[in-house]
Amino acid sequence: MEDFVRQCFNPMIVELAEKAMKEYGEDLKIETNKFAAICTHLEVCFMYSDFHFINEQGESIIVELDDPNALLKHRFEIIEGRDRTMAWTVVNSICNTTGAEKPKFLPDLYDYKENRFIEIGVTRREVHIYYLEKANKIKSEKTHIHIFSFTGEEMATKADYTLDEESRARIKTRLFTIRQEMASRGLWDSFRQSERGEETIEERFEITGTMRRLADQSLPPNFSCLENFRAYVDGFEPNGYIEGKLSQMSKEVNARIEPFLKTTPRPIRLPDGPPCSQRSKFLLMDALKLSIEDPSHEGEGIPLYDAIKCMRTFFGWKEPYVVKPHEKGINPNYLLSWKQVLAELQDIENEGKIPRTKNMKKTSQLKWALGENMAPEKVDFDDCKDISDLKQYDSDEPKLRSLSSWIQNEFNKACELTDSIWIELDEIGEDVAPIEHIASMRRNYFTAEVSHCRATEYIMKGVYINTALLNASCAAMDDFQLIPMISKCRTKEGRRKTNLYGFIIKGRSHLRNDTDVVNFVSMEFSLTDPRLEPHKWEKYCVLEIGDMLLRSAIGQVSRPMFLYVRTNGTSKIKMKWGMEMRRCLLQSLQQIESMIEAESSVKEKDMTKEFFENKSETWPIGESPKGVEEGSIGKVCRTLLAKSVFNSLYASPQLEGFSAESRKLLLVVQALRDNLEPGTFDLGGLYEAIEECLINDPWVLLNASWFNSFLTHALR
């Protein structure tokens, strides 16, 4: 523990803690847990005070380090960490100048803004128990108490937390990091169990007379005398407290807190049934691109011009035919729809002048595919409320589906590197503050790791398709507009490249509400034979439309080219979020940043450079049946990004529910791993809530399978 403390804390804090222990005649070689506790408390007091100043107008402001304004008056006077004589001198001086009441015990800080002393507490136990002990010891309404715990909880007098949320979050993050570092070295258990309650003068002396009456009068409500209150605090059981509170709520509520042990949790039950099918709005790993390098044609950048130019690069077109029919659809209509697209593109070329947009003829096959005139007629409720058997039409329960291997393959593919660059480094002006320099350095390192990633391609593809579809839905509400599915990238050599994945035909789109649906037919190129995994393509009709010559080790080989066609739909709100998919980059960057922050706070310097440039170090990526998978920092970046992208591509109520409910179980398991002796009630109900979200969604089923792998290895 002593070695850990010297590594983990600033040398100045360690020195102050050594002095304090010497002053109280304690041996830090023996009382190592106390040594760690004093250092932690000192650091929290310093962090509490950091960056907080009072300006000339007497207002509290936050100023980062290295700021020329740091000559402003400090908002907090730090009393903790001074020797006793000096500390009391400071307290007396404050009382004389501010008129504050002199405290009986040495407080930790004085707040010049609120004009009050502050007692800071850091506890390994329940915050409210420690708060009561502190309040009982101080017995002064003038001293403000603020308690932090290692689990992120806090409690303060009258729920007045003094600091802004961000400053308190820094303290909580640091405490959580210390706890994790201790746990990883096997020190946390002993440290947690070594905490003793606040020693008070009352425990050493018999209290009589006036003092006794005052003690009895200053108890919390519902306690008649000091003995009762002492007995309550000594015998306080948080789990029993929760049970009692629940039983007060209702006679029907009867919760018994059961201990949560390694043998308690069972795996999550995944549903049986036929394998799940692909439900993303566009093809992922199976997509094929027709591309042009260094585009410089007339009208370059206009989607229809780009699409026709890309189509001209392929010469292997042939008479299309259905190779994998859609079980419930009219497959000849899908075939006719593709032929219509080819014919209308040919008409454009024959005319010589390419229009900016193309509206398809409203043929019977497109009307069928886009559900034209299929929606039931809407009738005003007032006109039919007197009908006796009026009811909402029955909808079938979704059929249960089982997990299939294709979704894991999709995820693995999303984490891989491609041979193209999908995002540019943002051009940002020079940094003016150290924190900006660190932030842009992190962003640049992260961008370098993910710019070639396939998940980044999916982001740019999703942004383009959703933007184009939303624009067309608003600009051409009654038209069946042809929308090319395009993306732009750069080759490794830096040459620009335009890619065509296929086409979308949009249906009627009078979208008044956010959730109103626009139907569309997607037609996407692929080299994947659908007959290899027919269950994956349940919702598609697949045509063979040509033969493509590919370079291979044995020379050129010819491969059949397929077109994956399906009817689909989306809404304004879904398209709006699809246009925002770049946020996935930000989310995964923030996750990486929190890893860097944890590392930096232990080493007490910014570890960004070492983090990304130490290629020999491996990091945990996730769980698999084999155990904890590890990889380079680049692999971690790409895996986190792919998870974020798949959460966007496969967003659904099932995913929302599973994420929220499984997180509760995850927290309990984490608490067990940290030896926090968690207790639960109605664990069966929690499993039920998790499992009712496992219906047919491939991404949710995969996450549930990963969760089971985590359970297996976490509880060994």
UniProtKB/Swiss-Prot annotation:
Binds 2 manganese ions per subunit. One of its GO terms (molecular function) is endonuclease activity. The keyword Mitochondrion does not apply. GO terms for biological process: cap snatching; DNA-templated transcription; symbiont-mediated suppression of host gene expression; symbiont-mediated suppression of host mRNA transcription via inhibition of RNA polymerase II activity; viral RNA genome replication; viral translational frameshifting. Its EC number is 3.1.-.-. A motif (Nuclear localization signal 2 (NLS2)) lies at residues 184-247. Mn(2+) 1 binds at H41, D108, E119, I120. It comes from the Viruses. It is an enzyme of class 3 (hydrolase). Mn(2+) 2 binds at E80, D108. The keyword Transferase does not apply. Pfam families: Flu_PA. GO terms for cellular component: host cell cytoplasm; host cell nucleus. A motif (Nuclear localization signal 1 (NLS1)) lies at residues 124-139. It is found in: Host cytoplasm; Host nucleus. Phosphorylated on serines and threonines by host kinases, including human casein kinase II. Its cofactor is Mn(2+). InterPro entries: INFV_PA, PA/PA-X, PA/PA-X_sf. Keywords: Cap snatching, Endonuclease, Eukaryotic host gene expression shutoff by virus, Eukaryotic host transcription shutoff by virus, Host cytoplasm, Host gene expression shutoff by virus, Host nucleus, Host-virus interaction, Hydrolase, Inhibition of host RNA polymerase II by virus, Manganese, Metal-binding, Nuclease, Phosphoprotein. Belongs to the influenza viruses PA family. Influenza RNA polymerase is composed of three subunits: PB1, PB2 and PA. Interacts (via C-terminus) with PB1 (via N-terminus). Plays an essential role in viral RNA transcription and replication by forming the heterotrimeric polymerase complex together with PB1 and PB2 subunits. The complex transcribes viral mRNAs by using a unique mechanism called cap-snatching. It consists in the hijacking and cleavage of host capped pre-mRNAs. These short capped RNAs are then used as primers for viral mRNAs. The PB2 subunit is responsible for the binding of the 5' cap of cellular pre-mRNAs which are subsequently cleaved after 10-13 nucleotides by the PA subunit that carries the endonuclease activity. HAMAP family: INFV_PA (MF_04063). This is Polymerase acidic protein. It comes from Influenza A virus (strain A/Brazil/11/1978 H1N1). The gene is PA.
